[in-house]
């Protein structure tokens, strides 16, 4: 009997879970997924935490203690999210040790309201790194223009980074440069960079959502034939750039000093369009040295009926370039698509963060009144 997730791992794709909750940790579900589904990493975001906290009473005791202490909402959010991430880091510590620090990572996002403020992002990254206090933590920083310098400085201070909200190829080039510059600065400061790690989270399904809406408006048969093809092509071309960037003398010098490459991570991998296969953003993005973070529904769908027939990125670069040329030919402005997606991405996380703050504030209020 085939085991698609095991086959995916054997193909060199690291399987991560895009979810975290205290319930998942306390019931042993995360440990089960690590043991039986080959999960070797976890990503989180404000939306995930807001859902977890609003739908469980497992946070009540900590919220009660925080309310008695008079902790403000911002500090309460840090304390609660850091506790879950710390516990998840402990669940995955064995994976981290066994993989030499490549996998076993858990990601915690900085306040997304700081996405355009480099210095405050760096300060928040340092605070979260200290608060969680686990070597297998990733601090998530968005790939905004301000975020790029924060990424460099965070890495330079010896803090591992998950660069999030990457949509476009040119911005991805800048992310790789920010990563390498951070390592170079860390090395120049005398830091050991062998344990310093990073992933670059390239968002996938949202590209199809935005492009397909525009293709529908164009309405021609040529345009409609391109629906559901932009996101995979975009990710494949990103991997092509990754291969080129990490085959340079600049990277060779860093690798000789013990640096690990910044792996591409495919994020936003749940299928939004019901006409597309529910595992398309896994099956079509298989290459060694990549990460695919999936919500549990996608993970279980792939376990049930996913297929691995070999690499699906590198042999299809030419096809990806052709898709981009066809999109341009029918009138899709890809630069505008990417700019729109980045703006929407930051705003969505800001909105989720505000909801998270409101949820925590309400719980603090009720916990405090019952004290």
UniProtKB/Swiss-Prot annotation:
A GO term for molecular function: transaldolase activity
Key words, A-Z: Cytoplasm, Pentose shunt, Schiff base, Transferase
Localization (cell): Cytoplasm
Pfam families (UniProt xref): TAL_FSA (PF00923)
Pathway: Carbohydrate degradation; pentose phosphate pathway; D-glyceraldehyde 3-phosphate and beta-D-fructose 6-phosphate from D-ribose 5-phosphate and D-xylulose 5-phosphate (non-oxidative stage): step 2/3
Catalytic center residues: 140 (schiff-base intermediate with substrate)
Superkingdom of origin: Bacteria
PROSITE patterns per UniProt: TRANSALDOLASE_1
SUPFAM superfamilies noted in UniProt: Aldolase
Enzyme Commission number, as recorded: 2.2.1.2
GO biological process annotation, one example: pentose-phosphate shunt
Cellular-component GO terms for this entry: cytoplasm
Catalytic reaction annotation: D-sedoheptulose 7-phosphate + D-glyceraldehyde 3-phosphate = D-erythrose 4-phosphate + beta-D-fructose 6-phosphate
InterPro entries reported in the protein's UniProt record: Aldolase_TIM, TAL/FSA, Transaldolase_2, Transaldolase_AS
Predominant place of localization: cytoplasm
Role according to the record: Transaldolase is important for the balance of metabolites in the pentose-phosphate pathway.
Family: Belongs to the transaldolase family. Type 2 subfamily.
HAMAP family per record: Transaldolase_2 (MF_00493)
Protein name: Transaldolase
């Amino acid at each position: 009997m085939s085991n698609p997730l095991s086959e995916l791992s054997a193909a060199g794709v690291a399987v991560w879970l895009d979810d975290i909750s205290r319930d998942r940790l306390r019931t042993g579900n995360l440990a089960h997924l690590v043991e039986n589904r080959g999960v070797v990493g976890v990503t989180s975001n404000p939306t995930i935490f807001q859902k977890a906290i609003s739908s469980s009473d497992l946070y009540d005791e900590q919220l009660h203690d925080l309310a008695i202490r008079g902790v403000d909402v911002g500090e309460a959010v840090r304390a609660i999210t850091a506790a879950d991430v710390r516990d998840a880091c402990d669940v995955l510590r064995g994976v981290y040790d066994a993989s030499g620090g490549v996998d076993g990572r858990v990601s915690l996002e900085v306040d997304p309201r700081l996405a355009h403020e480099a210095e405050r992002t760096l300060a928040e990254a340092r605070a979260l790194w200290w608060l969680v206090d686990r070597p297998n933590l990733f601090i998530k920083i968005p790939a905004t223009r301000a975020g790029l310098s924060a990424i460099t400085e965070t890495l330079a201070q010896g803090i591992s980074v998950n660069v999030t909200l990457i949509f476009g190829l040119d911005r991805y080039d800048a992310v790789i440069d920010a990563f390498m510059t951070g390592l170079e600065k860390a090395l120049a400061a005398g830091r050991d960079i062998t344990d310093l790690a990073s992933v670059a989270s390239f968002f996938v399904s949202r590209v199809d959502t935005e492009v397909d809406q525009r293709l529908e408006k164009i309405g021609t048969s040529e345009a409609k034939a391109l629906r559901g093809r932009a996101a995979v092509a975009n990710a494949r071309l990103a991997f092509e750039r990754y291969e080129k960037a990490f085959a340079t003398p600049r990277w060779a010098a860093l690798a000789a000093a013990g640096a690990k490459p910044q792996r591409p991570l495919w994020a936003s991998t749940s299928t939004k369009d019901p006409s597309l296969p529910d595992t398309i953003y896994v099956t079509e993005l298989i290459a060694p040295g990549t990460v695919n973070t999936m919500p549990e529904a996608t993970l279980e769908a792939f376990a049930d009926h996913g297929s691995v027939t070999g690499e699906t990125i590198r042999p299809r670069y030419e096809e990806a370039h052709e898709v981009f040329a066809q999109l341009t030919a029918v009138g899709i402005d890809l630069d505008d698509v990417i700019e729109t997606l980045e703006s929407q991405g930051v705003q969505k996380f800001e909105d989720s963060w505000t909801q998270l703050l409101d949820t925590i504030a309400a719980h603090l209020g009720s916990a405090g009144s019952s004290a």
